Regions:
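Conserved non-cysteine loop/helix-boundary elements of the Radical SAM core domain that shape
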Residues: 69-93, 97-201
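Extreme N-terminal basic, low-complexity initiation segments
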Residues: 1-11
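Extreme N-terminal starter segment of soluble prokaryotic enzymes
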Residues: 47-51
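Polybasic, lysine-rich low-complexity intrinsically disordered segments
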Residues: 5-6, 29-32
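Local cysteine-cluster metal-coordination motifs and their immediate loop/turn environment
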Residues: 56-67
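Low-complexity, intrinsically disordered Ser/Thr/Pro- and acidic-rich segments
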Residues: 23-27
Length: 201
């Protein structure tokens, strides 16, 4: 649970542990790679490279969520800088394999400004082969989505939003400790569509 006294070192450790996931590998291939080496995974036709970045910050903790998060928003700038450095440090990890997807999850990535998220996406473009990049996703809370924020996010190259609506029933949202209500969720979807987002989940 969020705790203002949480050791920042725990935050960084969790962040770096989760920063990269390679998705799209069949279980059999993944097991083979674990027992041999990761090159076995890269040299299979079913391999797809994706980068996941975990933004661990939340304003509050939802009752159902077991993902790592904290409310130390004062650490956001330092953590984002560390993520950018980590992306560069792992430049050789994919061995030149083109990145197909980028997913920024959390936590609550929509607590970041579009320029902050754009800087991370830009670092990926600088460091990795993005010639095959098809999808850049950012998770967002409905109450964070304004017209200006969404328009700026489109400019940064984000083409998919995962909006954490969870329910359109206010009673359920209160029970889950969500910060928005059903009307805010409907408004957020409309704002995203007007900003040009066609891929919404």
């Amino acid at each position: 649970r969020p705790d203002e006294k949480k050791d920042p070192g725990d935050l960084y450790m969790s962040l770096f542990f989760h920063i990269f996931v390679i998705i799209g590998i069949r279980a059999e291939t993944a097991r083979k790679g674990m027992h041999n080496n990761r090159t076995d995974c890269f040299n299979t036709p079913d391999f797809m490279a994706g980068i996941y970045i975990h933004i661990p910050f939340c304003k509050s903790k939802c009752h159902y969520c077991d993902f790592y998060s904290c409310t130390l928003l004062a650490k956001k700038e330092a953590v984002l800088a560390a993520v950018a450095d980590e992306l560069a440090c792992r430049a050789g990890f994919l061995q030149g394999e083109p990145v197909r997807t980028v997913y920024v999850g959390g936590g609550t990535p929509s607590l970041c400004t579009p320029s902050e998220l754009g800087a991370l996406i830009g670092r990926i473009r600088d460091v990795y082969d993005v010639s095959g990049l098809q999808e850049v996703t950012v998770e967002a809370n409905p109450d964070d989505l304004t017209a200006d924020w969404l328009t700026a996010l489109r400019v940064e190259g984000v083409n998919r939003l995962s909006i954490g609506i969870q329910s359109f029933i206010d009673r359920d949202l209160r029970w889950m400790h969500r910060r928005h209500d059903a009307a805010s969720a409907v408004r957020a979807v409309g704002e995203a569509q007007r900003a040009g987002f066609e891929n919404l989940t």
